[in-house]
Amino acid sequence: MSRRMMKKPKLEETAGQGDPALPVYMLVGHGSMRPAYSVFKVDPYAGGAKGSPGRLLARLKCKHSKSFLPVRSKHGSWIVGVGGSSTKSRYGAEETIIFDTESHEVITGPNPGSTKPNPVLLAVGERIYAMARRPSINGRVDDAFDGRINFLPWFEVLDLSQAKVVGGCLTGCGWKALPSPAPVFPWGQNLHQYISRTTSDFAVRSYASVGCYILVSVSGQPGTYAFDTETEQWTTVDEKNDLPFIQLAIPHGPELFLGMSRATRAITAYKITVVAGVSLAIMEIPVLSDLPGDEEVMTTHNFLSLGIHRGFCSVTSWRVDESWDPPYLRAHIKMVAYGTEDFVEGRCIAVSKRWKQLFKIHDPVRTLDSPCVAGVFSI
C-alpha cells in the first residue's frame, strides 16, 4: 500500500503546545477477495508536518464486517476485532482477532458461538461483550413450522481475566452465551415473524457502557434498556425515551461521554448516570467552537476521545476513484484533532484549537472498502 501526507495542511494552531502526542490507531478495511484490515499509528497533533505520515504496523487477515474496540487488561493495550460476514473462505476464518499495540503481535482468539456481522462491542473491565446488531436465526422460512430453527446466541461475553497468550493464540478463555436481550429484541413473536420481519425491522441503534451497565436502544420500539454485567439481568430503565445519540457513546471523563446527537447530528457530550439499574439520568452538554469550519465537527461518525483535558479527534474518509463502481482503489482520509478548554461542570465543552491532516491511500492489489476507515482508537 502506498500512502503519503498532504504537503499543504490546513492548520489553525502549531502542534505541540503543551499537548502530549497521544498515539492514535486507525484501521483501514480492504477489499472483497482478500479481506483484511491495516493498522496505522498516527499522531493527531502532527498537523501535516513533514516526516510524520501514518505508520503501518500490521495487517490483520480476517473476515469482512468486523467490529473493533480498544481493551486494557493485565495483558496490556489491545485492539480487539470480533464478528464478520458469514462467507466462508480461506482468507480470515478467525472471528476474534487481537492486535497488541505494544508488541505489535497479532493474536488469534476463540470464535463466538455465532457469526455476528458488525456486532455491537463493549468492554467492561476485562470482559468483552458482543451483541448481534439485529436478531438473526439459522434456517429457512419453511423450517419455522417444524422446530428446525436454531436461535443464535445473540449476546455473548469473553472474559480475559484468566486468559493467556501462547504461540500467538489466546487460551484459557472462551465466549459464553448470555441471557438473550428479551426487552431489546421482541422475543414474543413466532418463528416465522423472526425470519420475515424482525431481522430487518429491529436493530441496535444506540449503546454505551456506563459503570457495570450496558445501555441499549433499538429501532422499531421506544425505550432504553440496561444489562447489569454483575447480575447478568436485563431491565428497562426508560420505557418512552431512546438514548439521545446515534450508535456508540464513547467515554470522555467520569460519567461523561461523547456521542453523535440524534437531534442535531453534532458531536455532543453527555453526562450519563444509571441509578440502581432502575432509572437513567442523562444531561446533554453542547460542544461549541468559534473556529471556522464548524461543520466538520457536525458530520463525522468516526471520532475518539483524547481525554477530558485534551479534546477529541474526528476522522472522515471518502473514495476518489473515477468510477462509482467497485473495486475501489483510492481514498482520502481526513483527521482533525480538536483541543478543548478545561471542562467546567454544567457548562459547554469549548473548542479552542484544531489540527488537520490529510492521508491519501492507494491499494491496487487488495482494493479498499467504502468507506475505508473501520475504526479509530486511542489507547
PLM region spans:
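Beta-propeller blade signature
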Residues: 35-48, 92-104, 142-173, 221-232, ...
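A sequence/structural signal of beta-propeller blade repeats
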Residues: 69-254
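C-terminal closing repeat unit and adjoining cap/tail of repeat-based domains
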Residues: 4-7, 274-379
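Beta-propeller fold detector
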Residues: 50-60, 107-113, 167-185, 236-239, ...
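Beta-propeller domains
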Residues: 2-111
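Long, repeat-rich segments with strong aromatic
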Residues: 221, 232-303
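Recurrent small/Gly-Pro-centered beta-turn motifs in extracellular repeat architectures
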Residues: 28-30, 82-85, 132-134, 218, ...
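Beta-propeller and closely related beta-sheet repeat lectin domains
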Residues: 7, 12-15, 25, 63-72, ...
